[in-house]
C-alpha cells in the first residue's frame, strides 16, 4: 500500500488520494474527467496529460502513442501512470469545465438491425452546453457478465438548439461492454450518467465548401453539424457522402431529405458498396472514395469532415 498521495493539478491546491491506482482513475474519482475510450487499457491514447513531476518511468504501453516531442515535454497516458509518490500534472483548462450529468432514457429507436438512437433527458444539471461535433463519455455500470464500470465515447447527434436532451447513435459491437449494456439492459425510463463534453471536431468558421464523409454510427456528429448549419442559416455549399455495405445499413434518409430542403446548398449522396439483387438500389455504388471522385472536382479546395470506420477513412 502506498497510503495517501498528493496530486497537484495546474499548480492549484493539491488533492489527496489513495495511492496505488492509476492517475486516470484517481482523477475520475475526484470528478476531474479526462477523455478515455478504452477502459484504461492504454489503447486509445485519449487520456494524455502532461506530468511535470512524480510520474515514474514511461511504460512500453505508452511509447507507441507518444511523439518525441511529447516524450520530451512529459506527456503521458494517465491510465498508465501509477500513483506511488506526489505528482504534479498539467491538463488543458477546458477539461476542468467538463462535468458529470445525471440523465434519464427518454426514447430508444431502432435505426438499423445493429444501430439504435438513444435520447437522454438531462436531470442534473438540466442543461448542457456543447459545441456541435463534440462527444460525451457514457458510463456503463456493472451488469451480469460485466464486473467493472467503464466509460465509452459517443458523439452527440441531436440539434444543439435543444440543450435539455442529447441523442447518441450507437452501433452494437459484438461482445462490446458498453454497447451490450445499451442494447440489452438499458430501457426507457432508466437513469444513466455521462460526462463531457469533449473534442475538437467542429465546423471551421470559413466559407469553404464542405465534404462530409461518414458511415454507420459516424452519422452522429455529422447530423449535429447539419442541425447547426440549419440553425445558423448557413449558405455554405456542402455535400454528404454516407457509406454502407448494403441497403440495410442505410438510415435517416427522410431526415437528410429535410436537410436538403432547408439548406439550399446541401446535397446528400448515400453510397452502397455491395448492393444485392432485389434491393432495387439505383443510387451510387462502390467505395465512398470513388463516389467522391465522381462528384467532387480533383482540385477542389473544400474542407473534408470524416467520421466512420478506419477502413473508410483511410480509403477516403
Label every PLM stretch briefly:
Residues 1, 64-121, 126:
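Fe-S ferredoxin-like electron-transfer domains
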Residues 1-43, 49-73, 237-316:
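Reductase modules of NAD(P)H-dependent flavoproteins
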Residues 46, 86-88, 135, 190-191:
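Residue-level marker of beta-strand positions
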Residues 100-190, 244-246, 271-275:
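Ferredoxin-reductase
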Residues 133, 218, 309:
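Short, conserved phosphate/pyrophosphate- and ester-handling motifs at nucleotide-, phospho-/glycolipid
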Residues 195-208:
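A short, basic/flexible loop-to-alpha-helix module at the beginning of a structural domain
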Residues 221-231:
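Histidine-anchored nucleotide/phosphate-binding helix
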